Amino acid sequence: MNVLVIGAGGREHALAYKLNQSNLVKQVFVIPGNEAMTPIAEVHTEISESDHQGILDFAKQQNVDWVVIGPEQPLIDGLADILRANGFKVFGPNKQAAQIEGSKLFAKKIMEKYNIPTADYKEVERKKDALTYIENCEFPVVVKKDGLAAGKGVIIADTIEAARSAIEIMYGDEEEGTVVFETFLEGEEFSLMTFVNGELAVPFDCIAQDHKRAFDHDEGPNTGGMGAYCPVPHISDDVLKLTNETIAQPIAKAMLNEGYQFFGVLYIGAILTKDGPKVIEFNARFGDPEAQVLLSRMESDLMQHIIDLDEGKRTEFKWKNEAIVGVMLASKGYPDAYEKGHKVSGFDLNENYFVSGLKKQGDTFVTSGGRVILAIGKGDNVHDAQRDAYEKVSQIQSDHLFYRHDIANKALQLK
């Protein structure tokens, strides 16, 4: 069958790589993709992921059987709805169901209604109300802007001054807009991907841990993710089971109950508190860079899993008996302003590197985004995989990239 992947980043690179391995898949297309994907897929950078008509026309011309949507924006914009209305099979939720990521308030209200464990929250609609709220709230407090923010719309404020600064960032020159304040939760964060079709929810039996902060020791601003690893040895199978029972199954039923038919992967960003696992966020798609490490470890056929889910079967994931560590190299300055167009070399176009922000200029690759390339390390355990990942990092040549030196350290310290 012919499969079309939508998106241009490392997550989509990993999806295309994994789908290309399937015996069920004849051809993988990617729109818009990036040139690093050309060994495994037919890439069409001339079509934008926001060009719904162009994507639809292409899918018709190429007799595409399945469309797999990687990023959140096309889901929120209703690309899945348009494709389904024209008879295409789509892995990814419709516009209504994608609100679970598109609106933090939408997600909080559903969790509140169905008693799904999460932090207490307060919503405000005006800047002046936000400034009033922080006069009497407990610190630290988590400040979240409603809507999509590429993983960067969350600020943890330790003081009232930091909270004021966060409010200024969220509102800018505007006086109105939804901001959600949450009680700060302490504990160990982890990411659980769950395949969902209506009330059928099948969680991965392998979790990943992301590293959101820009710099070592979890310092600096939030980013889209500076690295990830799996499995997470210090979070037990019992926690995974509990997360499934108290979060994954209830949210699938709650969405259906509220009239939202979710089909695709639901990312559960959770935290293990002293009171058990609680939800930090939901995403309506694979995490990035969690997808890259999880799909590298997945032994079974991703396309078969998607078909099983579509047919309402409880699919069984199989995993390689190894650990995976992924280290992200980003443009200096990210997640704030950064320069583009700097040469990057030294890496191979294979499963050891997944490209997020590079484009071809003549025969060389140059930077085109904030997060640039993820180096993948593999090993019998997290320690060996970490060493392998940083060896892969050392092969990359560029004066304009930075990376964290402590990806997966937590697993080694907490063993």
Swiss-Prot record:
Q: Which PANTHER family match?
A: PHOSPHORIBOSYLAMINE--GLYCINE LIGASE, PHOSPHORIBOSYLAMINE--GLYCINE LIGASE, CHLOROPLASTIC
Q: Which InterPro entries match?
A: ATP-grasp, ATP_grasp_subdomain_1, PreATP-grasp_dom_sf, PRibGlycinamid_synth_ATP-grasp, PRibGlycinamide_synth, PRibGlycinamide_synth_C-dom, PRibGlycinamide_synth_C_sf, PRibGlycinamide_synth_CS
Gene3D superfamilies in UniProt: 3.40.50.20, ATP-grasp fold, A domain, ATP-grasp fold, B domain, Phosphoribosylglycinamide synthetase, C-terminal domain
Please report a single Pfam family linked to this protein.
Answer: GARS_C
Q: Which residues bind Mg(2+)?
A: 281, 283
Required co-factor(s) are:
Mg(2+); Mn(2+)
Source species taxonomy: Bacteria, Bacillati, Bacillota, Bacilli, Bacillales
Q: What is this protein called?
A: Phosphoribosylamine--glycine ligase
Q: What is stated as this protein's family in its record? A: Belongs to the GARS family.
The record lists its disulfide bonds as: none
Q: From what organism does this protein derive?
A: Staphylococcus aureus (strain MRSA252)
Q: Please cite one Gene Ontology biological process associated with this protein.
A: purine nucleobase biosynthetic process
